[in-house]
Amino acid sequence: ILVEMNKLLCGQRCKEVLLDYSDVLGIFIPELLPCVGFSQQNVHHCYDIYTHTAYAVDAIRPEPILRWTMLLHDIGKVNTFTVDSRGQGHFYGHPRVSGDMAEEICARLRMRKRDREDIVTLIRWHDKNIPLTEKGIGTAMLALGEENFRRLLEVKRADNLAQAPEYRWVAEKIDAAEKLLDEMLRREPCLQLKDLAVNGNDLLALGYSGREIGLTLQ
């Protein structure tokens, strides 16, 4: 199933297949079915949850981890839906709920542990606000590592491109974040633990132990 799903998600006309055959996809991932036709009732969205998902998958480059992330990034929205006094829909906490559901789905499909962890991490981070500053980007880089941080920017861009046209300017902020990241890396600052001149063994030799090692490195 996983091999065929990867072919579908990374193949041509993926969006059309997702939209036309949601019932078939639901046989293998039934958690997606409640999203079909579910109105988001929010000015930022011009599509129901499932249609937004299909457009978001199509908006990101065809790499399995990225495509799976977009397929499952909002799968917990139905379970977190609320409406405020103005009639606007909200989905508070949906990244965490979606991440938990995605973890179960990916395990059921027998994905590799590393791929599963990356997908869940990206889903849990996809709605976080990352300040467009060196400190904000540095903090995210420290938590995610460069590869997943760059993936996260792609996820955020694709998510935004699948929203209402008048709110797609957010993608410009993602472009600016990528440029700032490249500038920071060109200056070769220490943005990740692996970039440090010391490691856990060095601190161990100096008498540090347990959690103290990780906290000191950070």
Question: Model segments located where?
Answer:
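Glycine- and charge-enriched loop/helix tracts that form the active or gating conduit
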Residues: 1-71, 75-93, 97-111, 204, ...
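Histidine-centered, transition-metal-coordinating active-site segments
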Residues: 10, 14, 95, 112-113, ...
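Non-catalytic alpha-helical coupling and interface elements of nucleotide-dependent molecular machines
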Residues: 10, 26, 80, 128, ...
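Short glycine-/small-residue-rich flexible loop motifs, especially phosphate/cofactor-binding loops
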Residues: 18-19, 103, 120, 152, ...
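A glycine-rich phosphate-binding loop feature that marks nucleotide/adenosyl-phosphate handling sites
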Residues: 23, 35-38, 74, 118-126, ...
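Histidine/acidic-rich helix-loop-helix segments that form or flank divalent-metal centers
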Residues: 40-58, 111-168
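Alpha-helical scaffolding flanking metal-ion-dependent phosphate/phosphodiester catalytic sites
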Residues: 63-66, 71-78, 137-185
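Charged substrate- and nucleic-acid-binding regions of tRNA-handling and nucleotidyl-transfer enzymes
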Residues: 104-108, 161-218
